[in-house]
């Protein structure tokens, strides 16, 4: 895997605080408007080609607390596909570890609240098949993969 230099400060404490605050605001607006505002990601590659966004309710692996996180998604038949890119940061996002520990989750889509799903990590073959579609949806995923040494996981959310 080829690694290029990520932006300076990507993994800084300040960046993490900004992301946390922005995510909290995103969740609040999405819930308030039932996804009519917040269901499209318009940052980075999403500025010119907005990417669909859902809210992911997942259970903390240590706390048991329910967390809600905005995540970009791709529809693949009855499944939803999400990417644990964390913007190319060195570590996987917390929601990924939570889904591995507690795969049952709930997603909220524009105009739809409370779809029950079960998460699983895509197999290597599934990831190879899905990655071009994911990059077509949000081109920055390819760039994020070059910023980190970790293999960015792809997660499939299946209906339950």
Regions found by a protein language model. Name each.
Residues 2-25, 157-159:
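Long, non-globular segments of proteins
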Residues 5-9, 86-141, 147-151, 159-160:
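Short, structured beta-strand-loop surface elements
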Residues 16-61:
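Short, conserved active-site entrance elements at the starts or edges of catalytic domains
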Residues 45-46, 72, 97:
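Short secondary-structure boundary/capping segments
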Residues 51-87:
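Short beta-strand segments
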Residues 53, 152-154:
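Short hydrophobic/aromatic beta-strand or adjacent loop that forms the aromatic wall/cage
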Residues 58, 75, 109, 157-159:
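Hydrophobic side chains in beta-strands
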